[in-house]
């Protein structure tokens, strides 16, 4: 939680409509889903255990840089395939409780490789957690392998190669995250071309901490979805491009406010994007670290920005339509949305 008051804490409980609305989530980091109690529990397996209070303290930060340090501190506690199995399974249980039918989840593969972990073994743990979660909770989940900008293009290529290795085992795409201010999208062109040539889908975090030029760069990488796109509104030509091409934008309201990327609730462009015809989706980003949930993000949109139930249903539909699911599965889930569950 940031040192400012948690934005979602002031919201009323999500409505019955929101709780019952079938949803998809497209911008969700596995490692950002670890609740403090679980992080403390995992740390007990090793020689540097955390108390719950110490774990909670890791999730306090004043801005985006502080958030990245908190994320790093949390991920350093993950060491074994069993750790990843635990958090994958528990994430799927949480998704089911929020009526999320499908999620596409970022895994920080770049960090695993940077730390010289045995990622092949870690992936087996991830798949065990996913398979158990799907069996018990009925949630559909696909993996997106995430590279870290500040590690550079060679490390990003290693992430993409791992995605290609596992692309027939529920790995659907690749993305690039981290600090946009340190490495522009153009550095990763070869990695994105390699991924596309091998049938992987493409996403990119862009316009979160920098301006519209980063979003243009992501589009030039042939990114099919844009994570955050917080500053697209500053460029009318870019807005027109997003609308004309119906490029899905992964909006993360609480995240943008808690990292201070958006200084005031009123300044967030969600409503502006929706009214202009941008294909927006709602997402949590790092729900445990921002003390939010997808139901609360929908409640945020309704209570702060005045979205009607019908408009929230349209946003939920965008989530399924913008997913990287195969056409048949996508139609199945859209039919469940239309049927109400």
Language-model segments: which ranges?
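Conserved hydrophobic beta-strand within the GNAT/NAT acetyltransferase core sheet
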Residues: 202-204
């Amino acid at each position: 939680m940031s040192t400012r008051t948690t934005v979602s804490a002031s919201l009323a409980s999500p409505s019955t409509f929101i709780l019952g609305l079938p949803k998809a989530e497209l911008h969700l980091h596995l490692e950002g889903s670890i609740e403090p109690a679980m992080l403390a529990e995992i740390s007990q397996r090793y020689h540097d255990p955390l108390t719950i209070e110490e774990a909670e303290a890791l999730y306090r930060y004043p801005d985006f840089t502080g958030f990245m340090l908190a994320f790093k501190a949390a991920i350093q506690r993950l060491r074994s395939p069993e750790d990843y199995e635990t958090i994958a399974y528990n994430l799927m249980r949480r998704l089911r409780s929020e009526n999320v039918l499908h999620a596409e989840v970022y895994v920080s593969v770049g960090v695993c490789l940077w730390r010289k972990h045995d990622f092949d073994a870690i992936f087996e743990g991830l798949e065990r957690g996913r398979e158990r979660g799907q069996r018990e909770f009925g949630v559909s989940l696909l993996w997106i392998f995430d590279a870290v900008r500040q590690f550079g293009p060679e490390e990003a290529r290693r992430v993409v190669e791992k995605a290609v290795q596992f692309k027939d085992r529920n790995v659907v795409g690749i993305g690039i995250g981290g600090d946009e201010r340190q490495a522009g999208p153009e550095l990763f062109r070869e990695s994105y071309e390699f991924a596309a040539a091998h049938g992987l889908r493409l996403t990119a975090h862009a316009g979160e901490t920098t301006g519209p030029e980063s979003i243009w760069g992501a589009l030039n990488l042939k990114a099919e979805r844009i994570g955050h796109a917080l500053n697209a509104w500053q460029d009318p030509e870019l807005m027109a491009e997003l609308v004309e091409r119906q490029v899905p934008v992964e909006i993360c309201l609480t995240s943008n406010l808690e990292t201070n990327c958006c200084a005031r609730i009123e300044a967030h462009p969600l409503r502006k994007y929706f009214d202009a015809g941008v294909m927006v989706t709602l997402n949590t980003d790092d729900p445990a670290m921002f003390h939010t949930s997808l139901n609360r993000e929908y409640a945020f949109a309704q209570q702060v920005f005045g979205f009607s139930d019908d408009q929230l249903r349209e946003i939920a539909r965008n989530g399924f339509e913008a997913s990287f699911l195969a056409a048949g599965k996508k139609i199945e889930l859209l039919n469940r949305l239309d049927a109400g569950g």
